């Protein structure tokens, strides 16, 4: 009993603490590792596909916004020269059929939600 210690009335043997390593077949462990690596690569591939699609959709949105900005710049230049573009005339008169882009559809959708919220 000279190697063991008595703590709180119990005899403790010296040795390693914690969980003892289980005797796992090395081939099974290697196969699990390979399977985990395959799954990791598949997740990584899906993540990159998602990010590429996200980037391309954002690039398309940026191009559309740039085109819209150019259109507004042209309108401003025309108004600086004293000309009123037909699109602006149509917006001012409320004629939505002649304008390719009108904000009135967005406002009607938003007005439905704001009226139902009771604000």
From Swiss-Prot:
Pfam families the record matches: bZIP_2
Location of region: Disordered: 1-23, 95-119
Top-level taxon in the UniProt lineage: Eukaryota
Basic motif: annotated span: 29-60
Subcellular location: Nucleus
Keywords recorded for this protein, A-Z: Activator, Differentiation, DNA-binding, Nucleus, Transcription, Transcription regulation
One GO biological process term: positive regulation of DNA-templated transcription
Start-end of Basic residues biased regions: 10-21
Gene Ontology CC terms, in alphabetical order: nucleus
Region annotation Leucine-zipper: where it falls in the sequence: 62-69
Protein family membership: Belongs to the bZIP family. ATF subfamily.
Function: Probable regulator of creb1 transcriptional activity which is involved in adipose cells differentiation. May also play a regulatory role in the cell cycle.
Stated name of the protein: cAMP-responsive element-binding protein-like 2
Record organism: Danio rerio
């Amino acid at each position: 009993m000279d190697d063991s210690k008595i703590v709180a009335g119990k005899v403790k043997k010296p040795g390693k603490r914690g969980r003892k390593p289980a005797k796992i077949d090395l081939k099974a462990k290697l196969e699990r590792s390979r399977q985990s690596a395959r799954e990791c690569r598949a997740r990584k591939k899906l993540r990159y596909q998602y990010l590429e699609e996200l980037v391309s959709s954002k690039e398309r949105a940026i191009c559309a916004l740039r085109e819209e900005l150019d259109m507004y710049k042209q309108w401003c230049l025309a108004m600086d020269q004293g000309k009123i573009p037909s699109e602006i005339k149509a917006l001012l008169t409320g004629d939505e059929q002649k304008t390719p882009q009108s904000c009135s559809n967005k406002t009607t959708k938003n007005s439905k939600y704001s009226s139902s919220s009771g604000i």
